[in-house]
Amino acid sequence: MANSGITGPTLKGLEKGASLAEFRNHLWNWDMNDFTQTFALNTTAAFFTVVAFLELLDKGNKAGNVEQKSQVICISSAGAFNRVPMAGYAYAGSKAAAVHIMKALATTLVPYDIRSNVLAPGRKSRYRPRTVLSYLFADDCSVS
């Protein structure tokens, strides 16, 4: 499971009804490194976490000591699909990029029998990472 997330620069502090010039100035004053770091953690780090485990996942498949095939799960965010940048443009963009990468991996990893999935929980979702992990590691594997 690849899970990471920082928001990066946000619209916090921008007055509601700001002029276009004020809006542009607010965005222009963001630290570009903060914006880039958001992608480095939310997208790049999640991708390389998956890459780091590919051979181990393949060994698990070849061992065949469980019914299901190996899979990778990346935690994205509902913000990846939201047109309103509630957590900021870098956050939404980085989480959308993570979704797309996992979709591409879902196709690329087919010959190796490794599944690739992405979860995109929202703020009040029952599918938040902690909840999902509790289901994955429950003795009876039930979802309430």
PLM region spans:
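Catalytic loop of short-chain dehydrogenase/reductase
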Residues: 5-39, 51, 55-111, 123-125
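Structured catalytic cores of enzymes that bind and process phosphorylated ligands/cofactors
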Residues: 46, 85-87, 137
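Hydrophobic structural elements of the Rossmann-like NAD(P)H-binding subdomain
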Residues: 1, 73, 116-119
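Short, highly charged low-complexity linear segments
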Residues: 110-115, 135-137
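Short intrinsically disordered, low-complexity coil segments enriched in acidic
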Residues: 1-8, 144
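A glycine/serine/threonine-rich, flexible loop-to-helix segment
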Residues: 14-18, 120-144
